Amino acid sequence: MKRYYYELMGEDYNSYEAAIPDGRIKARAIAQAKRAMRDLGIRRALLVVNSMRTSNILDIITVELD
């Protein structure tokens, strides 16, 4: 069962149009966010984790490329 949906955002909280599948495994979403960041040429972004049930923000994860 999918518990979270993800949104990739810049540090100014503007959304990038990156397709990160819904799911329940955050590590997989982070890996997909990094792949999208490489494609978009972004070095640092925020991965927002939202609840499927309430649509509330549960976590904001800073993602950086090495």
What is the meaning of each model-derived region?
Residues 13-20, 54-60:
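Surface-exposed loop/edge segments in extracytoplasmic proteins
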Residues 19, 23-44:
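A short, charged, amphipathic alpha-helix used as a generic interaction element across diverse proteins
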Residues 1-18:
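Short aromatic-glycine-(Arg/Gly/Cys) micro-motifs in beta-strand/loop hairpins
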Residues 37-66:
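Short, mixed-charge low-complexity intrinsically disordered segments
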